[in-house]
Structure formats: structure tokens, C-alpha cells
Regions:
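Bacterial N-terminal signal peptides that target proteins for export
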Residues: 1-3
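C-terminal motif of bacterial Sec signal peptides marking the signal peptidase cleavage site
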Residues: 13-16
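Bacterial signal peptide processing site
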Residues: 18-20
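Immediate post-signal-peptide N-terminus of mature secreted/exported proteins
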Residues: 22-74, 143-147, 173
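Heptad-repeat coiled-coil alpha-helices
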Residues: 52-55, 59-63, 122, 126-129, ...
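Long, amphipathic, charge-rich alpha-helical segments that form helical bundles/coiled-coils
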Residues: 77-136, 143-146
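Extended amphipathic alpha-helical interaction segments
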Residues: 120, 143-173
């Protein structure tokens, strides 16, 4: 029995060491490095666009003003924040560093975000014109719509981050 136990004890270290050389580093090609660089560049451009495009402070100021039916101190001119057209073109056309499904999801979410943002600020302008006409009923309807649009904008932003996060984490490795 002692010989059997001794043989088993000797066999385990040999079996566990014979699995091959685990010190080899994974082979990374130039294409992988270029792809990772494209992902990081796209992500950084996205961060800039998202930060500049939908400023939570401005959205909340518009909603607060609308909530008070224009009785709050007049807002300084609120205009949609400017976004560099080159950057918006980049985020709407993600490169081949992403698979087709991811590219489609990014395009859909950015398109939805751009549309919601445009409608949000257009509604605010219309809201102000309704207030001048003392048309409180239609103004109230726009407040409800803008609350929905602000929620949509937040959801689109979160979706974009959720889509990009796994790719950027992988690219940073």
C-alpha cells in the first residue's frame, strides 16, 4: 500500500508539470494592435461627443424652467451644444474594428440620440412660443414630451457606453 501511495504522489507533480510551457506570451499581430488603437480612438471620440452633445446640466435647466411654466428667472439662451461635425460623422460610421452587429447598434443608438436631442431643443423653442401666446395647455404637453426625450437621451448614452465597454476593455489589454 505504501508503494502505491508513493507512486501516486510522484505521478501528480509530473502530470501537472507536463501541460506545456505556460510562460509563452500570447502572439499579438500588427493588425490586432491597429484594431485596438481604432477602438480606443473611437471610444475617445465618443466620450467627447457624448460629453458635449447632451449636457445634463442644460437638460435639467430646460426641464426646470418648463416645470415652472416660465415663471422662473429667464434662462440665458439655451441652444443645443455644438458638436464637431467631423466627430459626429466618425461616431455614426464606426470602422471595421467592430463587427457588423456592433456597428449597427452604435449607428442606431447615435442616430436615436441625435434625433432625441434635436427634438428636445426644438420642443423647448416651441414651448417658449406657446408661453408668449399664453397657451399653457400645449406648453404642458411639451413638458411631458421633453421629460420622455430626456430619459431617451440618457438611455441612448448608457446603451452606447454598454456597447463600447467590452471592446475598450479588450483593446486596453
Amino acid at each position: 500500500n505504501l508503494l502505491l501511495v508513493g507512486a501516486l504522489v510522484s505521478a501528480f507533480p509530473l502530470a501537472s508539470c507536463s501541460g506545456g510551457d505556460k510562460s509563452k506570451a500570447p502572439v499579438v499581430s500588427t493588425a490586432d494592435i491597429e484594431n485596438a488603437a481604432e477602438v480606443i480612438k473611437y471610444y475617445n471620440t465618443s466620450l467627447g461627443v457624448l460629453k458635449d452633445m447632451v449636457k445634463e446640466k442644460d437638460v435639467n435647466a430646460v426641464l426646470d424652467y418648463m416645470e415652472q411654466k416660465g415663471k422662473a428667472p429667464a434662462l440665458s439662451a439655451i441652444v443645443p451644444p455644438a458638436v464637431v461635425s467631423k466627430d459626429s460623422a466618425i461616431v455614426l460610421n464606426p470602422g471595421n474594428c467592430f463587427n457588423e452587429e456592433t456597428r449597427q447598434n452604435l449607428k442606431q443608438n447615435y442616430t436615436g440620440l441625435f434625433q432625441a436631442r434635436t427634438e428636445f431643443y426644438a420642443n423647448f423653442d416651441t414651448y417658449l412660443s406657446y408661453l408668449k401666446k399664453k397657451d399653457v395647455t400645449n406648453a404642458k404637453k411639451l413638458l411631458d414630451v421633453n421629460y420622455q426625450l430626456s430619459t431617451q437621451m440618457s438611455e441612448y448614452k448608457q446603451n452606447i457606453f454598454d456597447i463600447l465597454s467590452p471592446f475598450t476593455e479588450q483593446a486596453e489589454l
